[in-house]
C-alpha cells in the first residue's frame, strides 16, 4: 500500500511517518503516528488504537479544541488556519494572534497550519512558532524541490537568528522573491 511505501522510505532517516486521519492504517503500516482533524476520531480514540508509543497529532481551531486535545493525550497540535488556505475552506481564521496565544499556553509542540508559504512564514516564526504544516505551498509550486528546500532553509535560518540574535534580512530578501 502507499502507506507502507511511505513508512519504508522514511525508515532510517531523521523523518517521522505520520498518517492522516486513519490510526488503523498507521498501525498496519508501522507508521510513527497519526494526525486527526476535528471531524475524525478523537485523540483519545486514536490513542486506544495506536497504543502508547506512537504519536497522535490533532488539528485545532480554538482554545476549546486545544484543551480537549491536551486532555485526550495528543502529542502535538496543529493550530489554524492561520491564513486563507487553497487546500481546505474555512469560514473564519484564528490568525497569528490565536497562534501566538496558543503557543504560549501549551507545552505541546505547536504546528501552524493553513495558507503558510514562503511569503508569510516569517510572520509565523515571529510569533514564536517554528513548526509548520504546508501543502499547497509545495504542491502548487513550479519547482517543488526548490520551494521545499527554501522553506526548510528559511526555518533553519530563522531558528539560528532567534537563538543567536542574528540579522537574516539579506537571506530573507533573496529567498522571498
Predicted regions and their residues:
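Alpha-helical scaffolding segments of alpha/beta enzyme cores, especially the outer helices
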Residues: 1-8, 24, 28, 41, ...
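Alpha-helix-loop-beta-strand connector modules within alpha/beta enzyme cores
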Residues: 2-16, 46-58, 92-112, 151
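Catalytic cores of alpha/beta
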Residues: 22-31, 62-72, 116-132
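Active-site beta-loop-alpha junctions enriched in small/polar residues
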Residues: 22, 39, 61-63, 82, ...
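Glycine/Thr-rich beta-alpha phosphate-binding loop at enzyme active sites
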Residues: 29-31, 36, 55-100, 104
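Hydrophobic faces of well-ordered beta-strands that scaffold small-molecule active sites
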Residues: 17-19, 34-36, 56-58, 77-79, ...
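Glycine-rich phosphate-binding active-site loops on the catalytic face of alpha/beta enzymes
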Residues: 38-45, 78-89, 125-147
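Hydrophobic alpha-helical signal peptides and transmembrane signal-/tail-anchor segments
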Residues: 152-176
